Every structure is written in structure tokens, then in C-alpha cells.
Amino acid sequence: MKIIPAIDLMDGQVVRLYKGDPKQKTVYSDDPVSVAKKWQKAGADMLHIVDLDATIGTGSNLDLIEKISKELSIPVEVAGGLRNEEIIDRAISFSNRVVIGTMAFKDKEMLQRIAKKYDFSKIVISVDHIDGFIVTHGWQESTKTPLLDAINEFVSMGFTEFLLTNVSKDGTLEGPDLEYLEKACAVQNANVIASGGISNIDDVSDVQRKNAFAVILGKALYENKISIEEAKQLVN
């Protein structure tokens, strides 16, 4: 299982939000490049960089993300607000993978076109949910689409990479949602990245037991409740 630290950017700063709420943010650093290098040095397999301003429509940190990517030797996955082809083209030009959420549900034709242009392995489908139903637009809009129906549909289209977040767990340190993680990981040909709620090394162990492809470390890492080194030791 891969260990992937998250760097969430807002106004050029490294922040964490509580349950995705921009009003409940904690700033951890004014120097995202040094944070990225720190996680790389600690042994991260990949970095998950989220543009929160783009997600909620208040700006863009894409120039900064490009700068961070160019400073690193490990793979970078870019997420947040990638809702049109032009922005996705740009993000893919300097990263290894892009995470697409809202647009994947709103425009499947464009999604297919982008996947065929770059390769399906470069596209990670973000399946964000509350109680098993998909939410989109930076978690502001709920849908009636069941999580597992969505994953199965994307797998049938040729997609294999998924980022699974239970929004009600994100940034809470309350432990991961193992119930839906287990169901998602049971879908054939789906590589699932578990995100949200990780609070300690035991949570990482629980996620690994559900056969997740990778785990995202966020708040627990920034609050020093877990280290990349101990997580790597566990999964190896």
C-alpha cells in the first residue's frame, strides 16, 4: 500500500479544512515547497496536492503546484477544481496524475476523451460521498448517485484509479470509514485510495487490511499524530 501525504493549498498556504469547510481552516505553513520536500525526504510514495481555491471557485494555485512538482523527484497527483479540458491539460503537463471529481459526473464524454488522450491510468476519479451517496462541486452539492454504482460505472468505462473520501470524516481525526472502503475495494479492477479521518498508525493498518491501493495522510501528519516513516514501516 502506498503512503501519500496531502498538501492542501489555499491562498498559497498549506492548510487543512474541517469536513471540507473553508470557514474552518488551519494554516500549517506559508512555504508549500519546503513542506513537499520534507514529505519526499521522509519517504512518501507520491504527493497529493489539492487546490482548494480552485475547488470552491475563489482562485487558483496551479502555478504554485507546478513549481512544487518541478522541485520533486516523486510522483505528484493534482486535485481540486479540474473542471475543464484546458486546466486538465495544463495540470497533466507537469504532474503524473490528475484527480477529477465534479466533471467526471457532469461530462462523461469529455472525461472519456481526456482519458483516451493521456491514458486511463493518469486519471483518478474522485468519489466523494456522504453516507454512500456521491457529492460534487467541492462537496457543496449532494446527489442521489450511490457510491458503488458510480465506481462500477467508471470501471466499465475503463477507469481503474479512484480516490475515496467520506466527507463527514475528512479533517476530523475520527478514524477512516472502513465500511464503504471495504465495499469499494471489493469492486474488481478498482485501485482505491483511502482518504479522510486517518488519526494514527492503527488506522493505516485498518485501511491496509481492507486492501486499499494507497492511503492519504492529512491532518494526522500535520498534527504529528503519525509519521510517514512509521506508516512506510508498517506497510512494508
UniProtKB/Swiss-Prot annotation:
Example of a GO biological process term: L-histidine biosynthetic process
InterPro entries: Aldolase_TIM (IPR013785), His_biosynth (IPR006062), HisA_bact_arch (IPR006063), Isoase_HisA-like (IPR044524), Isoase_HisA-like_bact (IPR023016), RibuloseP-bd_barrel (IPR011060)
Protein name as annotated: 1-(5-phosphoribosyl)-5-[(5-phosphoribosylamino)methylideneamino] imidazole-4-carboxamide isomerase
Active site: D8, D128
Entry's family note: Belongs to the HisA/HisF family.
Gene3D superfamilies hit by this protein: Aldolase class I
Reactions listed under catalytic activity: 1-(5-phospho-beta-D-ribosyl)-5-[(5-phospho-beta-D-ribosylamino)methylideneamino]imidazole-4-carboxamide = 5-[(5-phospho-1-deoxy-D-ribulos-1-ylimino)methylamino]-1-(5-phospho-beta-D-ribosyl)imidazole-4-carboxamide
Places the protein is found: Cytoplasm
CDD domains assigned: HisA
Enzyme Commission no: 5.3.1.16
Pathway: Amino-acid biosynthesis; L-histidine biosynthesis; L-histidine from 5-phospho-alpha-D-ribose 1-diphosphate: step 4/9
